[in-house]
Amino acid sequence: MPVLHNRISNQKLKEKMLAETQERQTLSFYKYFALDNPSMFRDKLYTQWNQLSVFGRVYIAKEGINAQISVPIDHYNDFKASLFNAHPALDQIRLNTALEDNGRSFWVLRMKVRQRIVADGIEDETFNPAHTGQYLKAHEVNEMIKDPDALFVDMRNHYEYEVGHFKNAIKVPSDTFREQLPMAVDMLKEDKEKKMVLYCTGGIRCEKASAYLLHHGFKNVYHVEGGIIEYVRTAKKKDLPLHFIGKNFVFDERMGERVSEEVIAHCHQCEQFCDTHVNCHNSACHLLFIQCAICSEKFSGCCSAICQEELELSPEEQRLRRSARGNKIKIFNKSKDVLETIMNKSIIDQGNKEG
């Protein structure tokens, strides 16, 4: 019986990936379709893709598949054959290739069976996910931009919106998609008759969100086909005006793809223009935040003086401090508000020391 999961440490896998000389293609895809036996489907795909040295993150559920992966160029055709033949619903499925790609997006294949391919928190049994809004292609998106009766709604997390978005798009400020859905309905409830243009990274979230808004009585709901990735690729290919500014945030080692030259975000520590996402170097924190090169040097890659101080302790001292702290300080959050709270506490503590 073959081993259908990884048994090697992340560090060794990452080192192995960085030492690779073969070229890779980063891509993403999703498909909503009925799947009777997700576990069996998962094991079949894992066996095939592991042999092809595919890396990445794949979620499989009774409602379909959602994947962000990297594939060796030499195995790309074999991978496509495997995917297209895996299920009739996946034949010739659109693959969103990365806008910027250094081939270092993933270093291990993780394939999981889940209840949903995107965590939506929807428990209403009358909800029909197949009743979705109308697709918009790139040129149609640009026409809709001109329509004063159309509202563009960003169906991504707030930290994704922060570094890049469609001009004048509405931000639904949340950390998760499940929080965002009811929040969007509440925020937009006075505009149910207007045209709602939903978008996300690759299309999976805005497709389900379009069905959710229709379920809640919105009349004219659209979503960008293929998400930001397909819109940008098509607009550049056809020399169309590009109305997305900044970076497209991605959930892999790259953390972002440059779309336009504008830098619209700010360093969370000094407020200088910056759109580089990093994780705090203190492994007990690992906060996702925006940090410029100057602050990275000043804080040793940490989100605050607290984490910087902890990082400089011996491993045993770090363990004791974390044990004493317990779960009282919540720092595992992608929210700038949480970061500001940590930084303010650092300033207060420093002031007390100086006093």
Curated annotation (Swiss-Prot):
GO terms for molecular function: oxidoreductase activity, acting on paired donors, with incorporation or reduction of molecular oxygen. The keyword Coiled coil does not apply. Disulfide bonds: none annotated. It is an enzyme of class 1 (oxidoreductase). This is tRNA uridine(34) hydroxylase. CDD domains: RHOD_YceA. The active site is at residue 200. Catalyzes oxygen-dependent 5-hydroxyuridine (ho5U) modification at position 34 in tRNAs. GO terms for biological process: tRNA modification. Residues 146-240 form the Rhodanese domain. Keywords: Oxidoreductase, tRNA processing. It catalyses: uridine(34) in tRNA + AH2 + O2 = 5-hydroxyuridine(34) in tRNA + A + H2O. The lineage of its organism: Bacteria, Pseudomonadati, Pseudomonadota, Gammaproteobacteria, Enterobacterales. Belongs to the TrhO family. Its EC number is 1.14.-.-. It comes from Hamiltonella defensa subsp. Acyrthosiphon pisum (strain 5AT). PROSITE patterns: RHODANESE_3.
